[in-house]
Amino acid sequence: MRTTDFAKHLTSFFTEYLIGERGVSPNTIRSYSESFSLLLNFLDEQVNIKADNLRLEHITRKMVLNFLDWLQDTKKSSNATRNQRLAALRSFCTYMQYEV
C-alpha cells in the first residue's frame, strides 16, 4: 500500500516538527493525536473517505467547519474541546505552509 501525501505529512508533523523542532509535551502529542483520530473517524463515517485514501486536497475550510460541528453535535464536545481540536488542525496547516 502506498502512503498518501496526507499520511506522509502528518507523520512528519508529529515526528519532525512537534517532537523534533518544537519539543512539545507528551500531553500535547496525545491531544493532537486524539484530534487527528477524531478527524479520520469523521471523514470515514460522514464523508466516506477512508484514512488510506485521504489526501491534502480533502482538507478544506468547509470540511473543517463540518468536522467542528460534528464534534459538538455528535460527540457532544464542549467549546473548549472543540477549540483544542481546531488548534491541532491549525498547527498542522501552519506547518504545511512551510513544507509544501
Language model region names:
Residues 11-27, 33, 37-100:
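N-terminal core-binding DNA-recognition domain of tyrosine recombinases/integrases
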Residues 2-5, 10-14:
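Short, motif-level signal for alpha-helix interfacial/capping segments enriched in acidic residues
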